């Protein structure tokens, strides 16, 4: 199997299949003079068994589907990683990405990707003892929800432009329910907890005074949101550079921005108000809202929520557009 690069198609650099494992095996499995092609489907079938510690024909088929959707290298032409979630972006009518240099383009069949998730669920009771399996399932679920969020956002925008308040209300309600479910899915993994990141920052300041602890947390909050002050965030385009899909950040940072945007659009549809701010004024208002969170010190858990991923998966798939 020839590769010019390794594809990353799950939400923002959180990979499910360890592409590097395959990449290294392609290079170093034999001497350079004796390199032979690797059958990716056969390799993935063995990888699924090694990763999950149990045999599952459904998991093998799921990996095959993932290879032809999110891990299809021919679909990755953007060079800036995986598609970014609209939930993580500053709210707008047209969203091309969350970060300035990313993309929100999803080039694969979303429903085919969901089929891979359904396949992963088939042997849930057998595979649930595998931490790798639970990570992969959570990782895929947040991508399912991210894909559906994009469809909900598009429908909200269309309803607004057609001045259809009923449809706008319907899909904005669905959108926020989806964000809530995303928060729950993320909360099942320590890797996806804001609290893990903030605790790590404060631990780096161990042995120093309270000011230094707070400074480290301030920097940790800024790095994953505004990156810096107004100039860096807006003029420099660095806001939402990392746009992490993390529990805590999703509920307390991304969701309030969308609540504000939806409230403004609804007020326009009902004739209660008109948003007359310039684009620059809107950007400055977003920054002020974001900066308030950066300066905050609200605690976030660094332990998982203990929710059942199978139940969350069924809810996530039911959201499918």
Task: Map each language-model feature to its residues.
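Substrate-binding groove of N-acetylhexosamine-processing glycoside hydrolases
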Residues: 1-321
